[in-house]
Amino acid sequence: MFVQKSIDLGHGRILSIETGKMAKQADGAAIVRLGDTMVLATVVSSKKTPPLGQDFFPLQVEYREKYSAAGRFPGGFFKREGRPSEKEILSARLIDRALRPLFPDGYYYETQIIISVISSDQVNDGDVLGGLAASAAIMVSDIPFQNPMSEVRVGRVNGLYIINPDVNELKESDIDMCIGGTNDTICMLEGEMNEISETEMLEAIQFGHTAIRKLCVLQQEVAAEVAKPKRLFVPTVIPTELDSFVRANCQSRLRELAYTPLGKEERAERTAAIYNETLAATLEHFRATISSEEAQADTAKALCLNEHIIEDQIHAVEKEVMRHMILDDAKRLDGRALDQVRPITIELGLIPRAHGSALFTRGETQALVTLTLGTQKDAQSVDNLTNSDDKRFYLHYNFPPFSVGECGRLGSIGRREIGHGNLAERSIKMVAPTEAEFPYTIRIVSDILESNGSSSMASVCGGTLALMDGGVPIRKPVSGIAMGLIKENDKYAVLSDILGNEDHLGDMDFKVSGTRDGITACQMDIKIDGLDYHIVENALEQARKGRLHILNEMEKAIPASRTDLATYAPRLTTIKIPSDCIGMVIGKGGETIRGITEETGAEINIADDGTVTIACTTKEGTDAALATIKSLTAKPEVGNIYVGKVRDVRDELGAFVEFLPKTDGLVHISEISSTRVAKVSDHLKVGDKVTVKLVDVRKDPRTGKTKFALSIKALEQPKQEGGEATQN
């Protein structure tokens, strides 16, 4: 059954949702169109019953942009799309984070959502359309789903908010924020801002939510016309006797442990001991009372003997204990107040060969951040359907397994690392200098050495400090903080600088970064329904206070960027040469420019407009490269003195001297010396270096070639009457 519905987003933007034409064998499929950008989303959920005791939802979200959608060919030898790009991974994460909380609790059936951009006008981005299409595909399927979810992008140009701004409007916008939500609540935020206030942030969220509500209604209308009944799903019900026995064995011990301020490692060891002892006692108890025949005949009794189910119940008790401790007594696992930030230590310049470095430690989270400065050649190439450019500021985030005391495989970078690095990069790039102010390519690398919550925000702080340590003239320092939330009915508590356990057992992870004057980036994931705006407002204000506290600590370590670059950082020198001289500097097959690099140790980049950038760690190398380039591009001028090399000797005519690269002139036999020269070879030989003066430039009327007349004699100092040379 084909159904199509559309809505006006404002400013003449018509968005449509259709289903029933494509991918009809999937459980659900929908196409969302805005302008000439079309996104197809499909969803399939396995009907195979998951194993008893499975405690996770195997949801896979894939977002792909096809070059054919814009009438383009992929790069590479095979001319075929390969592994997902960074943008595709980030877009998939946006959609996953918004959709995952909306599936029913206990729904553990393998589910795959594939979003494909099948048409692109290269103006309207497909990422937020993909989230809307994915939700619409689920809504028209038989998969159980709580509420429709919609994603929008909010921009602001000249003070006016815009829903789903195009790429040209985004260039002028001071806000680029993606919002995912249902009719009742916001469940996901991510974006970058140009130092906006908390009030402006809230306005942008509310503006976006108004559009989200309309899009959710549109999805419901489409789903109502399709009218596909939902498949039966009955969540696992935990037997009362199992819940009671587990509580009796571990609740008091977990409460006592929760009220004891401990480090992460010691708490984990004690918690594991309680888990193991409770699990053993529970299994022993129910194995004594339930026979194998009863377990096979009665699912409820089988649950009492399932180790995964028992561990889930212990975990539920642990979560309940911690949440009530925070809500009822305003106490946290490490003994801090709700709005208190962990102790901070900062060390700068630890890595001698890096161009800037910082070791930022906050509680049990530690980031070693290094800065590398390079040239335009080191910029990161970005090529997707809406953007083809070179990034000259980027941040890479690494999270090795030892940072949480675990063994793990090392290999390709995971989606989480890409996402965390992107958030930290967006946080800092708003204060990075422009290319005109600082013509370097800037790479920041954050290696997480310890982690107990908020490692991405540690990367923001460490990245800022590394830039300042390296002498990069940032506009203002940036800090970041992760906020948490515990909410039961109308009672709630907002937590500053959350621990890993508080993130895991809480209801919200809200990361906010910015300067003293405003927010530069944010990311929020909500695990509950019904998040009120006054809670977001309180969280933003509490985050502002925490952010300012961290900035104070950072400024104690380094109040401003250093005035000089690091010893081993390249020094950049820029000159402009005529465009028609570019080939002369590069040489045949790059021979000339390679020769300059080998001789001087300098790296040379030439732009199409003739701008030459010389990068070298030594002044001597820079000066040598600069002199060579100037000589290569110099124009011969009568009266100038040059040092040249004899290329050819004609005994009765004179000597040909290369006084500029690829430019020869003739020193006539009469211009070699003020005394009579009988034979040129008696005075000059091929390969000799000589100082000459350009005395004449003329065109050969027969050939049209320019000829240069040089003189050595003209440089001889005139003799005084006593025969002595004049001293200048």
UniProtKB/Swiss-Prot annotation:
GO terms for cellular component: cytosol. Its EC number is 2.7.7.8. It is found in: Cytoplasm. Residues 639-713 form the S1 motif domain. It comes from the Bacteria. Keywords: Cytoplasm, Magnesium, Metal-binding, Nucleotidyltransferase, RNA-binding, Transferase. Its cofactor is Mg(2+). One of its GO terms (biological process) is mRNA catabolic process. The keyword Amino-acid biosynthesis does not apply. Mg(2+) binds at D503, D509. The keyword RNA-binding applies. It catalyses: RNA(n+1) + phosphate = RNA(n) + a ribonucleoside 5'-diphosphate. Residues 570-629 form the KH domain. Involved in mRNA degradation. Catalyzes the phosphorolysis of single-stranded polyribonucleotides processively in the 3'- to 5'-direction. PANTHER family: POLYRIBONUCLEOTIDE NUCLEOTIDYLTRANSFERASE (PTHR11252), POLYRIBONUCLEOTIDE NUCLEOTIDYLTRANSFERASE 1, MITOCHONDRIAL (PTHR11252:SF0). Belongs to the polyribonucleotide nucleotidyltransferase family. This is Polyribonucleotide nucleotidyltransferase. It comes from Chlorobium chlorochromatii (strain CaD3). The gene is pnp.
